[in-house]
């Protein structure tokens, strides 16, 4: 993902996923692409931005907290979360924020 997500006027929500990866891929890239595709089909999904240079940061944008809750409990996403804990990440943190203002150029 190399583009900046097009989001509506605030308010909306951001889920910020920060991670450190373990060595090796072991299916990570395929699962990551699958999760972006699947998330984009979820009600309330607005967009996603991602970058990795040592530490990885993925920010997904959502219309409301209920949509985030539904995404977190999606069966395929639950499997990806489990695999992430078992083999892909040495550590991670998820934060959820309400976006009150945004600016762009």
Describe each region flagged by the PLM.
Residues 80-87:
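C-terminal structural segments of small proteins and small subunits
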């Amino acid at each position: 993902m190399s583009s900046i997500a097009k989001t509506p006027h605030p308010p909306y929500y951001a889920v910020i996923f920060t991670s450190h990866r373990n060595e090796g891929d072991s299916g990570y890239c395929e699962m990551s692409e699958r999760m972006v595709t699947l998330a984009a089909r979820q009600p309330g999904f607005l967009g996603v931005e991602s970058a990795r240079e040592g530490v990885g940061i993925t920010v997904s944008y959502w219309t409301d907290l209920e949509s985030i809750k539904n995404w977190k409990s999606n069966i395929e996403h639950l499997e990806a979360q489990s695999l992430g804990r078992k083999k892909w990440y040495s550590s991670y943190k998820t934060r959820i924020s309400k976006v009150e203002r945004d600016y762009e150029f």
